Amino acid sequence: MIAIVAILAGLLLPGLGRAKQKAQGIQCLNNHRQLLLAWRMYAEESRDRIPYASVHGSDRSRDSAVWVLGQLDFDGANRFNWDPNLSVRKSPLWKYCPSLTVWRCPGDRSTVTVTGRKLPRVRSMTMSVWAGGYGGEAPQDLDSGWRVYRSLVDMQDPGPSGTWILIDQREDSLNIGNFYTDMRGYPDAPETMRFAYDYPASYHGRAGGLSFADGHSEIRRWVDPRTMPTLTPGQRSRFNAEFTPSPRNADIRWLQERATRRTR
């Protein structure tokens, strides 16, 4: 009898695991669609201006238009990790989408310990740095000459359906509100490609969620193992504070193609 139960468990458990993964993927897509709709509603009520991906380097007056404030890590003393009143509820998108659950992928199980209790972190999503930039300005420490989109009408190339806005970021590389797609190597020098601090999440079987300016969302399966380095729960990635060469990485190329274009 015990042997029969063991055999049945061996047959059923993988199927249950796949069903759970599929359900999480569906919820992830729904979260992205809801938050992207809030992003579009904000723009439509702000004379077409989109929110900033991160704070400006010196002008704090722009902070109210930053999509989310605060830097995440695994320190329980850092309230931005676990207190939504400091970040999520202060987001300019909150009034259009007043739900805490949509900010976090259901596959993200990262926590911080606060006075002996494990609390979930408030978000897993980040915004493309090329959608809004640093208070509307371009990044200064990466290859210059790439367009920062500041309004919906700016997104003519690659176009709304081909420009990703939100992405689920790996828990060990999650930091400020933007996701930094380094455009180095695009389109004709793939041997110089690299990650700049940020890595996409792969919570859905080597795949992660994204949403695009036209409102649709996708689960993208990553194909290069370098996009998915070993993760130690509760610890910052050693890649988080450095540029990491990743020549001819098809995942970087995919993100670059859907991030921005050269300024003209």
Annotate each language-model stretch with its function.
Residues 1-20:
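N-terminal single-pass transmembrane signal-anchor helix
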Residues 3, 7-8, 24-27, 47:
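Conserved acidic
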Residues 9, 21-23, 41, 185:
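Hydrophobic alpha-helical segments, especially transmembrane helices
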Residues 18-32:
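Aliphatic-rich helix starts adjacent to a transmembrane/signal segment
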Residues 28-264:
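Short, well-structured segments within or immediately adjacent to enzyme catalytic domains
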